[in-house]
């Protein structure tokens, strides 16, 4: 069976991920006119720039959908977002600022939940608005086929017939008007935006040029913290975790995880927390640039990692970062539910997140400027009395440290001998300008002493 259909399968049911925007509206109407039977599926992902979700399926029916459904994906999306925080599943960072993989998380949930809904309706052909140059075409392909092994893919934007007739936004708008729908194109922004409850992605158009900065972006989840005219008073906030799960903000327990994320977004958004400018590597290895918002994810991540570093030992923290980065890349590639990702995720949640219990108090200021004011946890292995510089009972003595340092002589001697060997073979050039000017002049016998 051919998985990808290059031309419209007339007479067959086609599920389309319907956003209500011009592209998917024109595509749905065009498919109906060409003889297909379109079914519209809209994901409620808690998009901060969407005012009326209930109106979207109604518009789909007006444009010719056989049926239109609104699928509430918010609970599952927040669940996956919290899991990503627990695992540190983020691999794109610049100057200490993190991209929280909010779009890949959204695609994992959308791709599985919408295709599952289509399968319930006997719809086994799926179309969406992703283009052939981006990441989403592969993410949706993977998640769709994972959910329904019988799935076929039809994308109007890969169909030459559709492109020849309605290849641009102007043509789509004229098509809608000619068909009796007073559809006016929205005012073109200098960039495109994709969002969900976890975060927003701004990219393309003017943002493709690196001399266009964050200053051209109008945040939809926060404030323009770079604008000095925007007043942003400092705010103290506390975040509490129990076994790796955020349970309270400012001492208030929220009714569910969705409300928790919404409140975290409101708090972080008041300061512009979690905005970052990233150059990343797409799945096809071409670089792209995006400006991201994720105020709630950032707030929870900061508090979570503060507790984690005070609770776990160095080797565990090292594995958390290494495995989290690996997991983040798998998530970015559309492999969040692959076996290798599940293996990493399970170990990080089981052995790392389960011990992260406590409360962190922060002062938020402008943008990503904040201070940690207090960290409290019964699980802390940070114990100041162990290393105090004041007199008193100590867990180890000066003689203990002398013995420990003496044992280091073994590997120091081995290292010195290897450096000598490197210098003798010419691999290590020593001179007065290097940090090891004396190595090359050492006698072999002295090195071995």
UniProtKB/Swiss-Prot annotation:
<keyword id="KW-0067">ATP-binding</keyword>
<feature type="binding site">
    <location>
        <begin position="17"/>
        <end position="25"/>
    </location>
    <ligand>
        <name>ATP</name>
    </ligand>
</feature>
<protein>
    <recommendedName>
        <fullName>Argininosuccinate synthase</fullName>
        <ecNumber>6.3.4.5</ecNumber>
    </recommendedName>
</protein>
<feature type="binding site">
    <location>
        <position position="131"/>
    </location>
    <ligand>
        <name>L-aspartate</name>
    </ligand>
</feature>
<feature type="binding site">
    <location>
        <position position="99"/>
    </location>
    <ligand>
        <name>L-citrulline</name>
    </ligand>
</feature>
<dbReference type="GO" id="GO:0000050">
    <property type="term" value="P:urea cycle"/>
</dbReference>
<keyword id="KW-0963">Cytoplasm</keyword>
<feature type="binding site">
    <location>
        <position position="43"/>
    </location>
    <ligand>
        <name>ATP</name>
    </ligand>
</feature>
<feature type="binding site">
    <location>
        <position position="139"/>
    </location>
    <ligand>
        <name>L-citrulline</name>
    </ligand>
</feature>
<dbReference type="InterPro" id="IPR024074">
    <property type="entry name" value="AS_cat/multimer_dom_body"/>
</dbReference>
<dbReference type="InterPro" id="IPR018223">
    <property type="entry name" value="Arginosuc_synth_CS"/>
</dbReference>
<feature type="binding site">
    <location>
        <position position="131"/>
    </location>
    <ligand>
        <name>ATP</name>
    </ligand>
</feature>
<keyword id="KW-0547">Nucleotide-binding</keyword>
<dbReference type="InterPro" id="IPR023437">
    <property type="entry name" value="Arg_succ_synth_type2_subfam"/>
</dbReference>
<feature type="binding site">
    <location>
        <position position="135"/>
    </location>
    <ligand>
        <name>L-aspartate</name>
    </ligand>
</feature>
<dbReference type="InterPro" id="IPR023434">
    <property type="entry name" value="Arginosuc_synth_type_1_subfam"/>
</dbReference>
<dbReference type="GO" id="GO:0006526">
    <property type="term" value="P:L-arginine biosynthetic process"/>
</dbReference>
<feature type="binding site">
    <location>
        <position position="201"/>
    </location>
    <ligand>
        <name>L-citrulline</name>
    </ligand>
</feature>
<keyword id="KW-0436">Ligase</keyword>
<feature type="binding site">
    <location>
        <position position="192"/>
    </location>
    <ligand>
        <name>L-citrulline</name>
    </ligand>
</feature>
<dbReference type="InterPro" id="IPR001518">
    <property type="entry name" value="Arginosuc_synth"/>
</dbReference>
<keyword id="KW-0028">Amino-acid biosynthesis</keyword>
<dbReference type="GO" id="GO:0000053">
    <property type="term" value="P:argininosuccinate metabolic process"/>
</dbReference>
<dbReference type="GO" id="GO:0004055">
    <property type="term" value="F:argininosuccinate synthase activity"/>
</dbReference>
<keyword id="KW-0055">Arginine biosynthesis</keyword>
<dbReference type="GO" id="GO:0042803">
    <property type="term" value="F:protein homodimerization activity"/>
</dbReference>
<dbReference type="Pfam" id="PF00764">
    <property type="entry name" value="Arginosuc_synth"/>
</dbReference>
<comment type="subunit">
    <text>Homotetramer.</text>
</comment>
<feature type="binding site">
    <location>
        <position position="135"/>
    </location>
    <ligand>
        <name>L-citrulline</name>
    </ligand>
</feature>
<feature type="binding site">
    <location>
        <position position="194"/>
    </location>
    <ligand>
        <name>ATP</name>
    </ligand>
</feature>
<dbReference type="InterPro" id="IPR048267">
    <property type="entry name" value="Arginosuc_syn_N"/>
</dbReference>
<comment type="similarity">
    <text>Belongs to the argininosuccinate synthase family. Type 2 subfamily.</text>
</comment>
<feature type="binding site">
    <location>
        <position position="280"/>
    </location>
    <ligand>
        <name>L-citrulline</name>
    </ligand>
</feature>
<feature type="binding site">
    <location>
        <position position="129"/>
    </location>
    <ligand>
        <name>ATP</name>
    </ligand>
</feature>
<dbReference type="InterPro" id="IPR014729">
    <property type="entry name" value="Rossmann-like_a/b/a_fold"/>
</dbReference>
<dbReference type="InterPro" id="IPR048268">
    <property type="entry name" value="Arginosuc_syn_C"/>
</dbReference>
<dbReference type="GO" id="GO:0005737">
    <property type="term" value="C:cytoplasm"/>
</dbReference>
<dbReference type="Pfam" id="PF20979">
    <property type="entry name" value="Arginosuc_syn_C"/>
</dbReference>
<feature type="binding site">
    <location>
        <position position="136"/>
    </location>
    <ligand>
        <name>L-aspartate</name>
    </ligand>
</feature>
<feature type="binding site">
    <location>
        <position position="203"/>
    </location>
    <ligand>
        <name>L-citrulline</name>
    </ligand>
</feature>
<comment type="pathway">
    <text>Amino-acid biosynthesis; L-arginine biosynthesis; L-arginine from L-ornithine and carbamoyl phosphate: step 2/3.</text>
</comment>
<feature type="binding site">
    <location>
        <position position="136"/>
    </location>
    <ligand>
        <name>ATP</name>
    </ligand>
</feature>
